[in-house]
Amino acid sequence: MREKMIMTVFAVAAFSTNVAYAQLRKIPAEVTNVFTDKFPNATNIEWQDQLVDYKATFTDDGKNYSVKFSNNGEWKITERIIKKDFLPKSVIKGFSKGEYAKWEIKEVTIVEMPDYKKHFKITVAKNNLNKRDLLYNADGQLVKDNFTF
């Protein structure tokens, strides 16, 4: 009985390792080349394979960023966490007039995407289960309101 238990443990461990390893793909050259062109001074780069795209977290000029690229190297989004004190007055004004003004601000991010100029994402929470990502343009207009975890 003990032998079967030990063999089962080894089999599960071996299978688990193979499954975890199978999820990792090599980052395509198309992705890394576009990344290097866009962020030539990036340091502390860490890549994540998110199956439908690739995400890199890195430091550039002392600031922490995350960026996503499609599988073929198309730039999708860049985000950088900032302090809420660095939000433009127009965004603060727009947020303070909105329905989530009394919710707790959890995180503020500068967001850049190919289709948008610079935007500002404010993640707010009413409680542990009720959280929203609010995307504002530079004029302080709410562009997107998404439920988040």
Question: What is each PLM-predicted segment?
Answer:
Residues 23-149:
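Interaction-mediating elements
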Residues 1-26, 35:
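Bacterial Sec-dependent N-terminal signal peptides
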